[in-house]
Swiss-Prot record:
Organism expressing this protein natively: Methanococcus aeolicus (strain ATCC BAA-1280 / DSM 17508 / OCM 812 / Nankai-3)
PANTHER family: FAD SYNTHASE
Subunit structure of this chain's protein: Homodimer.
Name the UniProt record assigns to this protein: FAD synthase
Classification via CDD domains: cytidylyltransferase
Length: 156
């Protein structure tokens, strides 16, 4: 998927992107600022269920569609159900941006894995965005539960 134009810098980031919040947007803006083209890999529903123990609230195709509609994003694709490295190996990005809560990849291990496969990719880890009340999906869910459900079930 890498273009023949050696001057075009491709940036890739990945995530669940369930219940969009300003932290997601901040990560996407930052990722886009590092290159010319931003491609976002959306975690599959089944992958999220395996990792987090629950399916996302928003189905994968809707999450992909919403992310692709956000201004900094040039393209959004669904991840692989079988190999987390598959989209990276297809796209061959120059830079991979890992969000602050990225648990699928460790920056150093990912860089080493890709190097063994012949890809020299810069890995950047973003810091948590805390400039607003609802900077994570968990914060949004907590607020919904607080407003709409029995307040006793919320643990701080």
């Amino acid at each position: 998927m890498k273009t023949n134009d050696k001057t075009k810098k491709i940036v890739l980031t990945a995530g669940t992107f369930d219940l969009l919040h300003p932290g997601h947007h901040n990560t996407l803006k930052y990722a886009k600022s590092l290159g010319d083209e931003l491609i976002v890999v959306i975690a599959r529903d089944e992958t999220v269920k395996k990792i987090k123990g629950r399916k996302p609230v928003i189905p994968e195709n809707q999450r992909r569609e919403m992310i692709e509609a956000i201004k900094p994003v040039d393209k959004a694709i669904l991840g692989s159900l079988t190999d987390k490295l598959e989209p990276i190996l297809k796209i061959k990005p120059d830079i991979i941006v890992l969000g602050p809560d990225q648990i699928t990849f460790d920056a150093e291990n990912l860089k080493n894995e890709l190097k063994k496969l012949g890809l020299d990719v810069e890995i950047v880890k973003t810091k948590e965005y805390t400039n607003c009340d609802f900077h994570s999906s968990y914060d949004i869910i907590k607020e919904i539960v607080k407003r709409w459900c029995n307040k006793k079930i919320i643990k701080k």
